Amino acid sequence: MPRKGNGQLPLPDGWEEARDYDGKVFYIDHNSRQTSWIDPRDRLTKPLSFADCVGNELPWGWESSYDPQIGVYFINHINQTTQIEDPRKLWRNEQERMLKDYLMVAQDALSTQKELYHIKEQRLALALDEYVRLNDAYKEKSSSRTSLFSGSSSSTKYDPDILKAEISTTKVRVKKLKRELSQMKQELLYKEQGFETLQRIDQKMSGGQSGYELREAKDILSELKSIRKAISTGEKEKQDLMQSLVKLKERFHLEEARGRSEPDLRSNLANSHLSLSRQTLDAGSQTDISGDIGVRSRSNLAEKVRLSLQYEEAKRSMANLKIELAKLDSEAWPGALDVEKEKLMLINEKEELLKELQFVTTRRRTQGEIERLEGERRRLEEELLSVKSSPSKALAEQLKIQEKKKELVKKLEEVTKSATYLHSQLKSLSASTLSVSSGSSIGSLASSRGSLNTSSRGSLNSLSSTDLYYNQNEPAADLDYQYKLDFLLQEKSGYIPCGPITTIHENEVVHCHERIDYTNSPTAQQDTQDAKPPKSVTSLSSLSSLSSLSPPGSPPVLEGVFSLCTQDSLRTGFEISELPESFADMNLHENLQLMESVAGESQALAERKSTGEGLRHQSSASQEGRTDIEFPRKNPDRVQEEKAMCVSAAVSDESVAGDSGVYEPSVKPPGEDPVFNDDYSILGAAQAQLILRYDSGNSSFVIIIVKARNNLSYVQFGSRIYFRVAVLPSSNDTSCLFRTKVYPATESVLFNELFRVSISQTTLQQKTLRVDMCSVGKTHREDCLAGTQISLADFSFSNDVHTQWYTLLPSRTIPLHKEQLEKSVLSASNTQTAALDLDAVSALLERTSAELEAVEQELAQEDDDQEQLCPGDDWPEMAPEESFSTLEEHEADLLLSGEYYAVPLQLSSETTEKSEELYGETSNWDSVVSPLPQAELPTLVDKETNTEEALQENLSVRPKERANLGSRQRPFVRNSMIVRSQTFSPGEKNQYICRLNRSDSDSSTLAKKSPFIRNANERRSLRVKRPICQPMTRRTVHECRERTSLDLELDLQASLTRQSRLNDELQSLRDLKQRLEEMKARGETELPTCVLEDERFQRLLKQAEKQAEQSKEEQKQGLNAEKLMRKASKDVCRLREQSQKVPLQVQSFREKITYFTRAKISIPSLSADDV
């Protein structure tokens, strides 16, 4: 076919080109009198199939078009169909594959949680039955009271004090199991529904089914719009119901307050008048302002500068936190780590059930019931023995990363709120726009165009809040489960019946309304502050919008990417030298290090033979405590005070006095009884190593049983023993009795089991800690072999860790073995062999304590001498040239190659426009590399060049520049000071970074000479605003916007799921409101027990009260902070895409499909009746 003059092929004969009323081109075939959208010449010029296409070509018969509501869609003129998927790409197939893979993961997780629910049901049924039987036993035994160390009975199961503690602990366990089962039932229902929804979507959208056409996609978007309106209406109703609950709660409190006496009311009224008059006086003084207007304007300017600096620091902190979050390794599936947690918790629940079956009461049980329980116990033990997979170190590291991620998210939320508040303050100070440093020009966070609410093209974030790093309604972690999981991770070889299983009798020792999140503890905040990257030099000049910490053209340093302090906070191994810090904050990621260190210490002790060792091995707790762990140094003046507390009870009036909660044994001076100079441990007394600490942050008393030795002195070889710990007298609302795992007795046994008792300091001082070594037989009756009592009246509440060996005195007379008699004869030095007198035993213990005191004083003196010789930190500072040597090899290569020097937030054109309106003029977030784990605060300098000589001594060096440093050169740094006399010197001077103003930007120079490159960025004037990778950014955003029919179906089903769950929440709030109104109508003045004891109801009411107290301005700030937080979450995803090469669309799709099976119950249903 001949071509026209312009090279275009002519139309065939009988064909004509025309345009419709929309301006779209179509073709008329006059031969057949038909019209067609397809150019007849395309058959000759375009590929006929997708396999022949090159680049972005479409084959013959296909056309791409754009719809304002849907976006880009594709038309198949041959089949006369439309579709929203790009036929050239395989993203839809990849989505279907990921959905099928996740269905397998979700099915496994669902079966695990069902089994966990079934085990909890068994535990609840057993606990209810045990509670009834213990109550009956207490009623029968209440008339007869036996001594704790009475030798008349072989069992202390029905000792009144122990029995009362058993009853209260069982009661607390029943309540907790009821609440957990109620919550798990609702979560299981949601997860089953979500799993079924995903199955329906998979069946509908796979198997050769075609996607949605343009008309169907528009119908789905219209339905989505109506559902979101309904959700918005439901959210408003939810807020109204919560406010109603707050008013009802206040009415209950008012009814309680009316019972007070009239004088109290008068005094309160007088106080209110005083406070009112004072407020009126203050208000009057504020209106009568006198002074010069110029002074006020200068003060306002100073306040603006102060707020702007704080605003800059908040922005910089946000950038640092985003980078740190992006550096953390992401999970293969969101929530995949939760599945591993549930598997570990299933093992733990089985161990708890096995332990409860071991200690079940056989009283008034038939032989058939006993055999059934014994068969269940054997079956559980076989199941646990068959568990081959143990918690690996990799899983422990993932859990530590998850805890670090939670801490960073919490800090990011706080910084976001702070930035929003500072912006509002700046806005109120300035009548016009934000006239502060250009580095602070984030702009109005309340901009409607900058809103991050999800549009029709967005993800499900506005519906479900399932961002990778931001979930506002995520409940606080259960401390009991955190500790159980922590101990499970220490078992490196799975379930070992002959060793301790790191579980406690119930471990629900923290009362529900006294629990707080572990991240609120002071040490957790301190650790996160230590891990924070160093602050950059703050801008003080309003002309320095183009200033940076690097020369023109050099890539910006991402703050904290290779900060050593951050790397130190993410250690991959368990640091055994951090025991004091670990005990200062008992959370998951630090308890891992703690228990690892304790295990190392106890393992080292177990390898040592007890025979032939003298007094230091048997009685010096401080020396053995320093075997592998560096404990806090004790003040020698406090040693005598601690000795008055840490003693063992003897069979005397003092031991009986321990029952009353006040136990103060006499302390004799050293050397008072010279006849007992020999070590009592030679005589074979069993000992237990305990670690005690009071956690003032959580109001919890922490008890750790580390190990026991010389056990065979009280029990025959092959018997099964365990420890029983009780805090007496018992409390009705707190678990106070715990048991370790039963295991065969050996000479030395490692326990490493932790128990927590939620108790106040005042109450703890009235308690006595009782530790008993017991054995259990086939009759399930406890036989107390030996024990000790520790008075807590003088216990130190300074968060110090107290490690001590306690001698266990026998509860009844035990004949000495032949070998022990021979040792006692050889060591008695002309003393006749006779039965031990218990008063002599007490004297011997006091003698041992006195010698131990002298040893500890000597060690404390040595520590003081070492501190004088080596003041400062325990770890020496790192040399500058060694700072980068601690980095991993591949990270150093990335640093040098510039892979991490990409712009941290490369937004799309649309997002950039919104963010420019949201933030104003974007700014560079400066950063420096920290050479030390605890970096000093940088010196604030003016943006103009400095004329004084000020150079830092400790500097960080790039690895490749290390070899080029001469005697006259200093290493290249980002935070070095600028000296004008050296800025333009022709000779070889220090390398520097020039911070420039607009006035002298043309005089910029590079730190290093580079080869000549025409039109290089660094050779242009800094006044030119260079676009940063705009074409690539547009392509990236276009790919991320790509939407398939599967995405539309997921959006629709997620909206329906969110609406259904919101309706359930509304119904729960209506039921609770109705119940409170009925109670109020009956004249009751106290809230129901389920509201007072359930921590979820407490969080709900506190959240409602906080919202009720907020003003409109504060509510607006909260909404703006939430929007900014969502944007930060998206920025983290983009940074992760750059650093870890995880496509943003893959992250978004994974979040969508995991939303259905990750149910978080924010509003609980009314719990069952109490016991």
Swiss-Prot record:
Residues 534-551 have a biased composition (Low complexity). Residues 606-616, 625-637 have a biased composition (Basic and acidic residues). Residues 9-42, 56-89 form the WW domain. InterPro entries: C2_dom, C2_domain_sf, C2_WWC, WW_dom, WW_dom_sf, WWC/KIBRA_Hippo_Reg. It comes from the Eukaryota. It holds the Pfam family WW. Residues 684-806 form the C2 domain. The keyword Nucleotide-binding does not apply. Residues 120-193, 223-257, 301-420, 836-870, 1047-1123 form a coiled coil. Keywords: Coiled coil, Cytoplasm, Repeat, Repressor, Transcription, Transcription regulation. SUPFAM superfamilies: C2 domain (Calcium/lipid-binding domain, CaLB), WW domain. Negative regulator of the Hippo signaling pathway, also known as the Salvador-Warts-Hippo (SWH) pathway. This is Protein WWC2. It comes from Xenopus tropicalis (Western clawed frog). The lineage of its organism: Eukaryota, Metazoa, Chordata, Craniata, Vertebrata.
